[in-house]
Every structure is written in structure tokens, then in C-alpha cells.
């Protein structure tokens, strides 16, 4: 132990666990910001149902967690509140060697080349949805983003193609994934699902399971399994060093996990991007130009759209923290923390740091163009061995969907106040659903041709020099 280490927990508010739980549920990032202002970059909360939680906003301390021994820093244990939905073999809930081996087995569908093959289907899904948007009328775009991201998962991840089953999945999955606090209680305590008070939730899970097991059975029986590119097909084919493949239950758990981890999270990121762009006319104009360039095959267009996505996820993180439960005493941020404590890298606090991001409240995608991002200072997907498996997929999906929106419709800008982040389950959503207005449709063929003739992209003209952003 270092001679500068302190025994015990860092300081924190002395409020009761139930009061702190209410503050976290209702005020989330505002409460954490107030604690950081009073106690510094490391502080302790005692939240009912979670015990002691040590929050970290210093990148050096976060590096200790992300680079630490996975057998000491348990992320699966920290995610146990989702056990009733995800299942015991979910990648989010397992730890140690079991997690390492399962993640290795599941990685191929999320490699860059495999993800790139899904860009075309994602664009088609987005274009079909955009074609039905209302004109000259304000509407909440968040539900539209959820429709797009759900369809992307159903068709590219699950690989569903049967019209009847697809229709059933479109109906059942949103009902299952959009549960309230009462249902969340049963998901954290699976034994409650047998209680009649939660019978409706149990039936929703059973309906979803029946559809997913049917897809798994179809994939196993498909004579063209080897040629399929959907994620489920690749998971069915995957085998470990001993030739063992995943069981039906294991496959089911991973599909539900991918739905939970990749549906509302990406939809919310896209919603925030549109909420931010429509309040920044100059940036919106540059993004439209980048979308046209991207559609014409100009890599600079992709780069600027990626910068929009990265800056959105910085300034409006969808998830504002990630947790690890300590299995033994360990030194973090100058404190010798005991086993059982949850250490929590505070994504939202890091992303709002003026030391790391000058003028952090300014939405400025240019700061991300050509930037080298540190894994402990830009961390919307978590970090270390538990970094989101689908991070590359999510970034490609955000880029492609933004491109299709901006090249197909003209969005009105607004001077109304920005929407407030509101906690929905474990994600931060725009409190009014990210309301936008479509002024007109755009001639896709004309814009693509103009770009191909040399209109170019703002990123290609030096949106910013290559530099390190948020690095230590």
C-alpha cells in the first residue's frame, strides 16, 4: 500500500441512502456535479440498493479501474440489476474467465469489416423511415430514432426476415424494453417474476423469448448458415477452442443483451445529435455538407459526421456512469477501498471538465476533427476489458443514420432552449423527445451529384488540426 493512501472511504454527503437514491433518480448528473464541486474528483455516495459507490472523475483514477485486474474489478456484478431480463449468461452479467471467453466468442460480428457490411442495410432502413416523417410540423424525433435502431437490430443483428415474425418482434420488443420503475424492481430480483404482481412483465419476457428461440431454431436449420452475415448467424457458428458452441439459452441471453445495449442507447444518441444540430445553424450547415460528401464517397464527409457523433456523446452522454464492484481491497485515487464497494467512473463529469474540454458546454464537433481521444477522457462506451462490444457498430450506425437524415430532409433551426436530460431507466434522454421540424425534402440525386463535382466537405478543409483532445 502506498504511504499516501488513506484508509476508509472518500468523503461524501451524509444523507440517507433512500434520499440519495431519490436525488440520483431525479437529478442524476446535477447531483453528481454538486458533489464534485463540494468534495472533489473522488467522493462516496450511499445509494439504497447499491451500497457504497465511490465516484471518480480524475482520468488517472479511471485508468486504475479500466486497466485493473478484471478479477478484482467486477463489472458483471455491478450490472446485476438487469439479471431478470438479460439472463445469467449475458455478456453484461458475467465476470472473470467466463466473460473473457464469451467476449472472444462474440467479437467477430463487431469487427470493423463485419460492421462495414451492415452500412447499406442501415441506410435503407433509415431512408424508409425518413420518408414517412411529417412536413412543416414539429414532432418528437426520439420515437423515430427508436424505430430505426430497433429495425436495424432486428434485421442486421437478429437477421429476422419472416414478415409475420418481424411484425411480432416490432410489437413485443418495445413493450419489453420500455418498462417502468416497478418492473425494474423485478428485473433486479428475478424471483419476483413469479409473483402475480409482475405477471404482465413475465408474459412480455415469455413472448419475446418465444420469438427469439424461433429465430435461433431457424438459424440452426438454415442450409445457408455459413453464408449469412447477420450477427445471430455468426454467433450460432462461433465455437471455442474445444469446438463448443453456444446453447439456445446462451444465444437468447446475448440477443436480449444486444437489444438492450444497442437499441435505446443509439437512438438516444441520434436524438441528442439532432437536438443539438437544430440549435446550432452553422454546425448544421456543415453537417449537411458533410452528409452530401459522405454520400458521394468522400471520406472527409464521414469524418465530420463522426465528429458530430463524438461531440454529441461527449456533451450529452447517454449513460453518465459505469460501475465495478471490488472483490478485494484495492488502492484507487489515494484511498484503500474495501471489498464490496462499487467504484464508478463518472462519464458525465469527465466529459464536462473544462480542463479536458475548453468551454465544455459549447457544442463544437470541430474539436473532434482529427483529434486523438484518450480512453479515460472520452468514454461514452465505458472502457477497459468491458468497453461496449458494439461501440464500432454504434458509431457507424450514428454516422449512416445522420447522413441519411441530413441528405434527405431540410431541418428547421430553432432558438428555443435546449432540452433537459431526463433519466429513463439507466439512460439520459431529451425531456421532450428531441422535437424537430422538417422544412422540406431534399433532392438526393442532385445533392450527390453536386458533391461529386467538388462541393467538398468542411472537414476536408481543415475543421481543425490534428491534435489530442481530452488527453493527459
UniProtKB/Swiss-Prot annotation:
Q: Which Gene3D superfamilies does this entry report, sorted A to Z?
A: Cytochrome P450 (1.10.630.10)
Q: Which domain of life is it from?
A: Bacteria
Give the Enzyme Commission number: 1.14.-.-
Sorted keywords for this record are: Heme, Iron, Metal-binding, Monooxygenase, Oxidoreductase
Q: Where is the composition biased (Low complexity)?
A: 452-472
Q: Where does heme bind?
A: 388
Q: Which CDD domains match?
A: CYP110-like
One Gene Ontology cellular component = cytosol
- Any one Pfam family match given in the protein's UniProt record, by short name: p450
Q: Where is this region: Disordered?
A: 442-472
Gene Ontology MF annotations: heme binding; iron ion binding; monooxygenase activity; oxidoreductase activity; oxidoreductase activity, acting on paired donors, with incorporation or reduction of molecular oxygen
What is the protein name stated in its UniProt record?
Putative cytochrome P450 135B1
The UniProt entry, under SUPFAM superfamilies, shows: Cytochrome P450
InterPro entries documented for this protein: Cyt_P450, Cyt_P450_CS, Cyt_P450_E_grp-I, Cyt_P450_sf, Cytochrome_P450_monoxygenase
Name its co-factor(s): heme
Tell me which species this is from. Mycobacterium tuberculosis (strain ATCC 25618 / H37Rv)
Q: Name the protein family.
A: Belongs to the cytochrome P450 family.
Amino acid at each position: 500500500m502506498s504511504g499516501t493512501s488513506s484508509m476508509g472511504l472518500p468523503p461524501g454527503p451524509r444523507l440517507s441512502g433512500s434520499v440519495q437514491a431519490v436525488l440520483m433518480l431525479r437529478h442524476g448528473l446535477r447531483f453528481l456535479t454538486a458533489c464534485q464541486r463540494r468534495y472533489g474528483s473522488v467522493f462516496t455516495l450511499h445509494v439504497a440498493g447499491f451500497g457504497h459507490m465511490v465516484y471518480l472523475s480524475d482520468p488517472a483514477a479511471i485508468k486504475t479501474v479500466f486497466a485493473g485486474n478484471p478479477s478484482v474489478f467486477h463489472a458483471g456484478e455491478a450490472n446485476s440489476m438487469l439479471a431478470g431480463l438479460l439472463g445469467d449468461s449475458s455478456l453484461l452479467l458475467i465476470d472473470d474467465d467466463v466473460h473473457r471467453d464469451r467476449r472472444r466468442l462474440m467479437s467477430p460480428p463487431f469487427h470493423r469489416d463485419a460492421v462495414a457490411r451492415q452500412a447499406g442495410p442501415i441506410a435503407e432502413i433509415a431512408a424508409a423511415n425518413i420518408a414517412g416523417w411529417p412536413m412543416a410540423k414539429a414532432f418528437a424525433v426520439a420515437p423515430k430514432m427508436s424505430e430505426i435502431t430497433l429495425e436495424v437490430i432486428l434485421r442486421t443483428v437478429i437477421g429476422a426476415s419472416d414478415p409475420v415474425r418481424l411484425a411480432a418482434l416490432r410489437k413485443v420488443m418495445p413493450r419489453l424494453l420500455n418498462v417502468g420503475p416497478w418492473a425494474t424492481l423485478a428485473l433486479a430480483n428475478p424471483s419476483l417474476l413469479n409473483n402475480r404482481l409482475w405477471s404482465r412483465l413475465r408474459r412480455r419476457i415469455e413472448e419475446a423469448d418465444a420469438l427469439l428461440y424461433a429465430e435461433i431454431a431457424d438459424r440452426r436449420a438454415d442450409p445457408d448458415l455459413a453464408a449469412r452475415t447477420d450477427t445471430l448467424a455468426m454467433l450460432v457458428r462461433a465455437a471455442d477452442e474445444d469446438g463448443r458452441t453456444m446453447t439456445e439459452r446462451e444465444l437468447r441471453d446475448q440477443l436480449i443483451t444486444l437489444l438492450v445495449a444497442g437499441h435505446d442507447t443509439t437512438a438516444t444518441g441520434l436524438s441528442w445529435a439532432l437536438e443539438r444540430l437544430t440549435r446550432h445553424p452553422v454546425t448544421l450547415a456543415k453537417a449537411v455538407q458533410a452528409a452530401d460528401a459522405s454520400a458521394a464517397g468522400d471520406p472527409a464527409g464521414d469524418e465530420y459526421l463522426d465528429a458530430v457523433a463524438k461531440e454529441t456523446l461527449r456533451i450529452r452522454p447517454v449513460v453518465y456512469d459505469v460501475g465495478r464492484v471490488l472483490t478485494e481491497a484495492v488502492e484507487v485515487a489515494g484511498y484503500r477501498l474495501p471489498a464490496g464497494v462499487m467504484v464508478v467512473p463518472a462519464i458525465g463529469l469527465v466529459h464536462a471538465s473544462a480542463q479536458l474540454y475548453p468551454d465544455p458546454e459549447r457544442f463544437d464537433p470541430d474539436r473532434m476533427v482529427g483529434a486523438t481521444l484518450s480512453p479515460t477522457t472520452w468514454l461514452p462506451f465505458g472502457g477497459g476489458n468491458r468497453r461496449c462490444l458494439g461501440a464500432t457498430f454504434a458509431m457507424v450506425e450514428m454516422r449512416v443514420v445522420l447522413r441519411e437524415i441530413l441528405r434527405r430532409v431540410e431541418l428547421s433551426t430553432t432558438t428555443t432552449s435546449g432540452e433537459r436530460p431526463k433519466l429513463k431507466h439507466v439512460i439520459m434522454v431529451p425531456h421532450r423527445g428531441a422535437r424537430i421540424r422538417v422544412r422540406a425534402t431534399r433532392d438526393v440525386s442532385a445533392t450527390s451529384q453536386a458533391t461529386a463535382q467538388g462541393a467538398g466537405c468542411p472537414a476536408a478543409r481543415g475543421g481543425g488540426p490534428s491534435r489530442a483532445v481530452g488527453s493527459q
